[in-house]
UniProtKB/Swiss-Prot annotation:
A Pfam family annotated for this UniProt entry: p450
Keywords noted in UniProt: Heme, Iron, Membrane, Metal-binding, Monooxygenase, Oxidoreductase, Transmembrane, Transmembrane helix
Keyword Oxidoreductase (UniProt): yes
Identification of the protein by name: Cytochrome P450 71A18
Gene responsible for this protein: CYP71A18
Enzyme Commission number(s) of this protein: 1.14.-.-
């Protein structure tokens, strides 16, 4: 009797739950979601990503549309592949999409996410960004470091002159990393710590951090598999590398404090701000260390990567190289002398070349992910709070509806009469992003890139050893924190002095 009653109660409860679920499903508001490819339980759409996610996501967008919803494990990912959809994300609803998703690597490596590049949106982030822009990245501050850029570019030119005299090839990829790192080191820290092993290996630590930031910790997306990040050493590596970088930078900061200098490098500027209170906001010691790290990551992942793609495309397109050389050499006398930043200001074709390389090879083809903080409609679709957003700048920059049937071609001429700039106002061209999260270091990066390119091309002719592509360097990519060349660019400089 008791058993019969128990079974009856269980069946009644089950039937009630089923009816309730059916009722709630019927009465629930219908949600209009973006198109989605079929996904596998547990991993979602992770199996559809290749080693070049910007390309695989572009291919998916051609089938499912410029706004599609994927799932990386349990995390919903909105992929944006058109300028119209990007406008709604970065302009119309910019504030709702201004946050960053949580990441094990960012939290462990970047001061708990208390930095400008990766930090969550909020009052603290706004204050930190304001400190960065108003004190470190103003046009006046960038201009004040012109002498540093001139000295470091000239040092690189001397290496190239020696290579030219001995008919030797140079690894331009490595030269560009050294150049941008030395400039960043002098601007940020007051001297060149990059190659100084006695300082504790800044080069080693920054590269380790960049390598870890490019990793894909599966536990962020599939919590049930978080144990993999533990047993493969990822978790412990984050702790080790972050501590080593922090200890190294503590020594650098102490050197500045003991020297008592008032040299206008970023550390001294930030130390002076640390002593002040601005509306109750105070810069902490760790904030200084990791704002400097932002500078190194931004400098290496933008400037050096851009320079190697510029030289790659110019060597592959000799007619473009010749046009640029003619522009530079027709205005500079005598040949072989250093080309100053003021002389570069009116070089229209040089600026067009840089813009075109940013279009076809954006260093960050997938703009750093954003996190939606409240429900919103985008292009008529319902997007739920907690959705991560990936904007495929690579796809937008190659859209034939915007750029014409030759969108895949390298053609600097398309920018000669264009009003496009790097500030993301027109969402068809967003190499530095747009909105509240746009890269704040645009002027710092472009000042170095323009003067470096003018001297590289104005003072030397360039060639490469014949390979599988003839006398052209390949275009193979390596996807990481940025997208650089898979193979280093090795080229022969020939001085025209």
């Amino acid at each position: 009797m008791e058993m019969t009653l128990m079974v009856s109660l269980c069946l009644t409860t089950l039937l009630t739950l089923l009816l309730l679920k059916k009722f709630l499903k019927r009465t629930a508001k219908k949600v209009n979601l973006p198109p989605s490819p079929w996904r596998i339980p547990v991993i979602g759409n992770l199996h559809q990503l290749s080693l070049h996610p910007h390309r695989s996501l572009h291919s998916l967008s051609l089938r499912y549309g410029p706004l599609m919803l994927l799932h990386f494990g349990r995390v919903p990912i909105l992929v944006v592949s058109s300028s119209e959809a990007a406008h709604e994300i970065l302009k119309t609803h910019d504030l709702k999409f201004a946050n960053r998703p949580k990441s094990k690597a960012v939290h462990g490596l970047m001061n708990g996410g208390r930095d400008v590049v990766f930090g969550p949106y909020g009052e603290y982030w706004r204050q930190m960004k304001s400190v960065c822009i108003l004190n470190l990245l103003t046009n006046k501050m960038v201009a004040s470091f012109e002498k540093v850029r001139e000295e470091e570019v000239n040092a690189m030119m001397e290496k190239l002159e020696k290579a030219s005299c001995s008919s030797s090839a140079e690894n331009l990829s490595e030269l560009f990393v050294t150049l941008t790192s030395d400039v960043t080191s002098r601007v940020s820290l007051g001297k060149k710590y990059w190659e100084d092993e006695t300082a504790g290996g800044l080069k080693k630590r920054v590269r380790q951090i960049m390598e870890l930031l490019r990793e894909f910790p599966i536990g962020d997306y599939v919590p049930a598999l978080a144990w993999i990040d533990r047993i493969n050493g990822f978790n412990s590596k984050i702790v080790e590398v972050s501590r080593a970088y922090s200890d190294l930078m503590e020594k650098v900061v102490q050197e500045h404090l003991e020297a008592g200098e008032h040299k206008a490098d970023f550390v001294n500027i930030l130390l002076s701000i640390e002593k002040e209170k601005n509306n109750g906001f105070k810069v902490q010691r760790n904030d200084i260390k990791f704002m400097i790290l932002d500078m190194f990551i931004g400098g290496i992942s933008t400037s050096s990567t851009l320079l190697e793609w510029i030289m790659t495309e110019l060597i592959r397109n000799p007619e473009c190289m010749k046009k640029l050389q003619n522009e530079i050499r027709s205005t500079i006398r005598p040949h072989g002398s250093y080309i100053k930043e003021k002389e570069v200001e009116n070089m229209r074709y040089l600026k067009a070349v840089i813009k075109e390389v940013f279009r076809v090879h954006p260093p960050l083809p997938l703009i750093l992910p954003r996190l939606l903080t409240e429900d919103v409609k985008v292009k008529g679709y319902d997007i739920a709070a907690g959705t991560e957003v990936l904007i495929n700048a690579w796809s937008i920059h190659r859209d034939p509806a915007i750029w014409g049937p030759d969108a895949e071609e390298f053609k600097p001429e398309r920018h000669l009469d264009s009003t496009l700039d790097y500030h993301g106002q027109d969402l068809k061209y967003i190499p530095f992003g747009s909105g509240r999260r746009i890269c704040p270091g645009i002027n710092l990066a472009m000042g170095l890139v323009e003067v470096t390119l003018a001297n590289l091309v104005g003072r030397f002719d360039w060639s490469v050893d014949p390979g599988p592509n003839g006398d052209q360097p390949d275009l193979a990519e390596d996807f990481g924190l940025d997208v650089c060349r898979k193979n280093p660019l090795i080229a022969f400089p020939s001085s025209v002095a």
